[in-house]
């Protein structure tokens, strides 16, 4: 989709059309740009940019918080349209997916007709534009979809066509080459895709297995199948929050970790996942980040996540914190899960759950909020962020 969040907002509010629109944090808040429309990009604003830098570049822009409930609803309709044409659908984001239309289209011409039909239906049914790439591989299709944005359509039929299109472009045009990898290549004098093709052994020596893949892509090779996302294949489940002002209060940070742990528990339970590792993420006030991990018996218990992240936090120096996060990793489903002490001794789980309930009671007394009665609402949309900001101001 083209500037998805911003396009949805402009569709629903005609007054926003033609104006630079930045979705993310507000200018006086901490945060980044989630997305922006093409009018804002003319000022140099882009996704992931610090919001204050965006405001410096585009002070006349319209700044809005994202409305994820609205975007998810549109995303569901998009998937319904896509599913009419694809035998396999691999969702990359709310607004982006790979579609394997081979079995339904049966010919290149029909595949191209499907692409145009998807564009037509997206415009007529959702009043949104999209850019579609038709190609022989996932990498080529992604490249094609970016070629004529916005409202674009482009075809790359063969590896030779792909190479001819990109070989004189910056190496960063390859979607497997991030900024750090690009800098490594640049220091070695490898600037373009053609350079990668001319010096494949050097790229492999420099980057190892990643270099092998990048070299293959530079030659137009990509045999990856379109694979529908399966939650059980996820490597981690996590939740994090950025504070509007740095926080050093350990009691408050542990209260936030309890809410984050409950959120992680809910996400893991939704997909039937358990984890054997807990991760704490912290970003200090100077923007330096670190993660700490601990091993736990197979669990998705908020109590276990809370206890372990609290323990990990206690190992860190007391410094102003800008962001804090909790996560569960080494994931697996019920079938591969080993029996834990909670299965053998249910009273252990009960005692830990009681610790969570007592923690919520203490938080109610401290902040004046009924957390137990409002957990469903707290974890909905942006409410968790707003709740934590209220807690920070009223502690």
Where are the model-predicted features located?
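Short, contiguous acidic/charged loop-to-helix segments that flank catalytic cores in large enzymes
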Residues: 295-300, 345-351
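Gly/Gly-Pro- and Ser/Thr-rich, intrinsically disordered tail segments characteristic of DNA damage-repair
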Residues: 1-216, 226, 266, 347-395
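DNA-contacting surface of Y-family translesion DNA polymerases
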Residues: 173, 181-323, 333-336
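Non-catalytic, largely sequence-independent nucleic-acid-binding elements associated
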Residues: 329-334, 395
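Short, charged/polar, Gly/Pro-enriched secondary-structure boundary elements
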Residues: 105-109, 332-339
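Glycine-rich beta-alpha junction loops
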Residues: 136, 284, 330
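Short, hydrophobic beta-strand segments
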Residues: 97-103, 289-294, 339-345
């Amino acid at each position: 989709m083209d500037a998805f969040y911003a396009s949805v907002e402009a569709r629903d509010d005609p007054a926003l059309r033609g104006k630079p629109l930045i979705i993310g944090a507000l200018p006086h808040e901490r945060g980044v740009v989630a997305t922006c429309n093409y009018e804002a990009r003319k000022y140099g604003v882009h996704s992931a940019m610090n919001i204050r830098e965006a405001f410096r570049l585009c002070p006349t822009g319209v700044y809005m918080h994202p409305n994820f409930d609205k975007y998810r609803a549109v995303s569901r309709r998009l998937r319904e349209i896509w599913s009419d044409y694809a035998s396999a659908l691999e969702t990359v984001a709310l607004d982006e997916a790979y579609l394997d239309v081979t079995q339904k289209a049966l010919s290149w011409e029909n595949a191209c007709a499907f692409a145009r039909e998807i564009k037509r239906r997206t415009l007529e049914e959702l009043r949104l534009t999209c850019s579609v790439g038709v190609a022989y591989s996932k990498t080529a299709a992604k490249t094609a979809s970016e070629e004529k944005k916005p409202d674009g359509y482009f075809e790359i039929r063969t590896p030779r066509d792909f190479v001819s299109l990109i070989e004189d472009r910056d190496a960063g045009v390859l979607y497997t080459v991030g900024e750090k990898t690009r800098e490594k290549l640049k220091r070695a004098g490898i600037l373009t895709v053609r350079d990668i093709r001319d010096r494949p052994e050097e790229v492999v020596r420099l980057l190892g297995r990643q270099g092998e893949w990048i070299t293959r892509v530079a030659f137009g090779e990509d045999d990856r199948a379109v694979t529908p996302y399966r939650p059980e294949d996820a490597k981690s489940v996590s939740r994090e929050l950025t504070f509007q002002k740095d926080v050093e209060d350990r009691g408050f940070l542990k209260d936030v970790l309890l809410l984050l742990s409950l959120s992680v528990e809910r996400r893991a339970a939704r997909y039937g996942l358990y984890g054997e590792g807990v991760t704490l993420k912290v970003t200090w006030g100077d923007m330096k980040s670190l993660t700490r991990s601990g091993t736990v018996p197979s669990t998705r218990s908020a109590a276990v996540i809370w206890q372990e992240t609290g323990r990990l936090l206690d190992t860190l120096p007391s410094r102003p914190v800008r962001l804090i996060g909790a996560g569960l990793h080494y994931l697996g489903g019920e079938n591969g899960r080993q029996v834990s002490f909670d299965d053998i001794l249910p009273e252990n789980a009960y005692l830990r759950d009681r610790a969570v309930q007592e923690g919520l009671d203490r938080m109610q007394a401290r902040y004046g909020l009924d957390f137990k009665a409002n957990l469903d609402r707290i974890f909905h949309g942006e409410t968790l962020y707003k709740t934590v900001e209220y807690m920070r101001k009223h502690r």
